[in-house]
Each structure stands twice: as structure tokens, then as C-alpha cells.
Amino acid sequence: MVNFQGMHFSADDHSTSKAVVFPILIVIIFLFLSKANAEVYIDKIGRQVDIPSPPRRIVSLAPSITETLFALGLDRQVAGVTMLSTCPEAARSKPRVGTFVNISLERVVGLNPDLVIGTADGNRKETVKQLEGVGLPVYVVNPVSLAEISDMILSIGRITDREDEATTLVRGLHKRARRIAVSLKWLKRPRVFLQIGINPVITAGRGTLHNELIHRAGGVNVYGETPFRYPRCSIEDIIAKTPDIIIVSSMRRGGDFPAVRDGWKKWDAIPAVRDDRIYIIDADLIDHASPRVIDGLEKMAEIIHPGSSLKRE
């Protein structure tokens, strides 16, 4: 029995050990040879990470990270992504390393990456520890607000030698966000209920990116003061909160969202139902803490204030 960084391999299981150990050894040798060109960075949860300069094979552990890497022109360096990394179109052809919350260690190691980028708000701590345990540099980001998304973009640009591209991208995002703020500054803020779960009905509370998007889009989140980030909601409570607008997010892929929207119509005590202000928004635009979130903000602003003079670039 061989104990390798907490992983046990039996001599009786040759196929499993070869499939896992050999790629790990290759990665360790590759990383050892690249150490001379490594630079030390502090990631967003305070960990020290040695990263080759520049990294040439990057594995992304979240759709938001994948979108950021592609936005910085790093498509050739992206060696692997998660299952729901579908944007941009070129990301669909990249090797998959598992789901957002269930990453396959063997698949990541088998891609021989010299950098793995994960997120604290989604990836499991055990996953990061396992990847570290086999010698992989794992840089963790933690964007849960628009300001932190900008910081993430700049950080990823810094560790991948794309600082100029990152700065240009962030400036463009800030310009679009300012345009929205100016356009909506003097408009009345309607009350908004955002539905991001079907069964049970779930919404977004305080401390979430969704809550910030509603506010920046000129609305008031009717659950914005709840201490829970993603609380379950009863229909009675939603009626009591009298939302002027209901926005249904297509969070569960394959759901019959027109039917969900129509299902609200029997609750005509709700102002949003009475005034026929029930809308559907693409979840990918508001769920991923990536540069594309500005598209989600613009779309949400158009929903909440359809008569405004908001201009999209």
C-alpha cells in the first residue's frame, strides 16, 4: 500500500493506480521544472500560491471563471472547464472536469494544468485541498458583488499576464454601469420579486449579487432585508410583500418557464400580476459573477424601467 498525500493506492488495483498516479507524477515533474519561473500571489481567501509566469494550461472550476478567461483572450490557455461552462461558444469544446460542486480530481490532473482557478462561493474546500495535495497551484477567487467581479478580473489578468486586457475590460464595465446609474437616478423604484427556484420557490436576499443587481437596475428587492442569502418563500408572504414586478430566472435548465410565469396569474392580489408585469430573464446573465453580468444588469434595468432612455453598447 502506497500513501501519497493522503491518497491510498493498493498494489492489487493496477488500473486505478496507473490512471491516477502517472498523471500526478507528470504534473509534479512539470510543476517542479516550472518553479524557476513561478511568482508568488495571495489569492482572495488569503492563501499564498506559486504560479508559473505565465501559466500555459489553466483549468477553470466555475462558469464565471471560464467566461472571464475567454474575455481576457486566454481561450488557448484554457485546458478544462466545468459542465455548465457554455459561454462563449468556444468553451463548449473544452474538456470537462465535472460539475461546479463535484470536480473530478482525476480529470483535472489528467489535463496537466499549471494553474487551477476556483471560487470560494461554490467549489468545495475539500476539492481545493485535494488539488493542492497533488501539487497543483490553485488560485481561489470570491466575487459576490460587482466591485469584487472587477477585482477578480484584474486579479486573473495579473496572474495570467493579461493586465492590460483586464484593465480595459474593467473600464468598459464601469462605463456601462455608470450609464445605467445616470439613466435611472431620478426614477421611482418599483418593488421587485426575483424568483430563482421553482419547487420550492426561492429568492435572493441580502448579501447576494442578485440583490445588488436589482438595486442597481432601479428596483427594490422585496426580500432585500432578509438575513438569509437564498430564502424559501411562501405564496402568502410574497402576496404580503406586494411586488410591482416579478422576474423569473431560468435557473433550472429545461424548466417550463412560460408555464411558471402563467402560474402566477391566479394570484391577482399581487400588483405585478394585476398589471401583467411578470418577466423571464436568462439565468446565465445574472447568476455568473463574470464580465457578462453587466449584460444581466442592463437587461434587468430594461425590465424594471422599460420606458427609460437606457442605451446599451
Predicted regions and their residues:
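Short helix-initiation/N-cap motifs at beta->coil->alpha
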Residues: 44-46, 97-106, 122, 226-236
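N-terminal secretory signal peptides that target proteins for export/translocation
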Residues: 1-17
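Short helices/loops that flank or line small-molecule/ion binding pockets
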Residues: 105-112, 134, 233-242
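Bacterial N-terminal signal peptides
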Residues: 22-32
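A ligand-binding cleft/hinge motif common to bilobed small-molecule-binding domains
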Residues: 122-133, 245-262
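His/Asp/Glu-enriched short active-site or ligand-binding loop at hydrolase and phosphoryl-transfer sites
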Residues: 82, 207-230, 250, 279-280
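A short, structured surface patch at a secondary-structure boundary
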Residues: 39, 56-122, 222, 267
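Extracytoplasmic substrate-binding proteins
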Residues: 38-41, 47-48, 57, 114-115, ...
